[in-house]
Amino acid sequence: MSLREFRKAGHPPTLAAAFLYFDVSFMVWVLLGPLAPFLAESLKLTATQKGVLTAIPLLGGSFFRPILGWMTERYGGRRTGLIGLSVSLIPLALGWQLANTYGQFLALGLLLGVAGASFAAALPLASGWYPPEHQGLAMGIAGAGNSGTLLATLFAPRLAQALGWHSVFGIAMVPVCLVWIAFFLMAKDAPGARVTKQWKDYASILKEADSWWFCFIYSITFGGFVGLASYLSVFFHDQYHLTKVQAGDFTTVVVLFGSFLRPVGGMLADRLGGYRMLLVLLTGIAVCLAGVAMLPPAMAALGLLAGAMAMMGMGNGSVFQLVPQRFVGRVGILTGVVGAAGGFGGFLLPSALGAIKDRTGTFGLGFAVLAFVALAGAGALLGIGRIWRSQWDAESARRAGLYTGGEACEGYAAAE
């Protein structure tokens, strides 16, 4: 696959629009994370409360993602994206003008989940323009919009320190409005009749065991990425006593690796197979998080977390290289379901780290638990791969990278 072939295969303006939509939505979705040290100081929050505060938008994202997935199937990704961007302005306006208590911020955080639900519209919008052999890179580029997290972690602490945290919410409305205009002008739904799904279709897809495996793996890769992106400002500030701005900068460095390596993960998954990639990546994530569990010096923790996030980002691209191979014609629905699982995994991560910190006085045990979950994911994937090899058609199995060694030759022959 060459980049020239990739450009000719789809619709670059729509791919760019999907990226921008996802990017600014991610910025909004995780905004409470880099602001958490400021809010915790102002509201006198415990470690558990800080964990829940940074996690609640992720729970909101889990709730709204199936809804936006259904809307994408029914109304198209373009219209759904415009609605999502419009609704995302509401919690920003509330944070700017009204929110002053912990309870109000929890309600605001749930509404921020609409921005997190952008996943269910942006990825099918981009995916619809590209054939299966280009899905990994297309989904990776659109999904690299999770780099919007960088905008939040880099600028939100500085703006909060200079202008007050209320102002940050108002300022964030500006890029949302600009992206709305760009999305309106650039995005275009892929040709072809849309097949409208009913809520029973979501229930039906959940009856298939493979959908649960995708949910579990994605809750580790994407859930780990967004959960850490939202919580690391608190971790660096509380564990290493960095200033609020320094904690945001450390988080920015970590998120940088995960965001921009997502397309690389998609590209490698197109060539090597998403299954093969995930086996390596999940194991690597477990090793890095186990290192963080030892609470090494700040710079060592920074390097280990950057490594973990890089592999989580590549894992996100790899998961969605697998989805079209297994669920042909149902990418929109499964994207919503799997995305919801990823968001829920992200919600559990900060909540668990905060609660464990309150009960044990250390972050170490929390990161050890995360390492174990990642390793369990690799083990589960290794086992389910044997079943997939016997159930999937030869061409899909070949693209997924389910064949190894001599099996690869047999798989290629069967596909031909």
Which ranges hold each PLM region?
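Conserved MFS/SLC helix-loop-helix module at the cytosolic interface between two early adjacent transmembrane helices
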Residues: F63-T101, A269, Y275
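Cytoplasmic helix-loop-helix junction between adjacent transmembrane helices
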Residues: L108-G145
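C-terminal transmembrane helical hairpin of 12-TM major facilitator-type secondary transporters
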Residues: L272-V319
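C-terminal membrane-cytosol helix-exit motif in multi-pass small-molecule transporters
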Residues: M173-A193, G377-G385
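Helix-loop-helix hairpin linking two adjacent transmembrane segments in secondary transporters
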Residues: I141-L185
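Residue-level signature of mid-helix packing/kink "hotspots" within the transmembrane helices
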Residues: V30, L58-P66, A117, T149-L151, ...
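Glycine-rich segments within core transmembrane alpha-helices of 12-TM secondary carriers
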Residues: G136-L154, G339-L349
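Extracytoplasmic gate region of multi-pass secondary transporters
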Residues: L32-A36, D210-F260
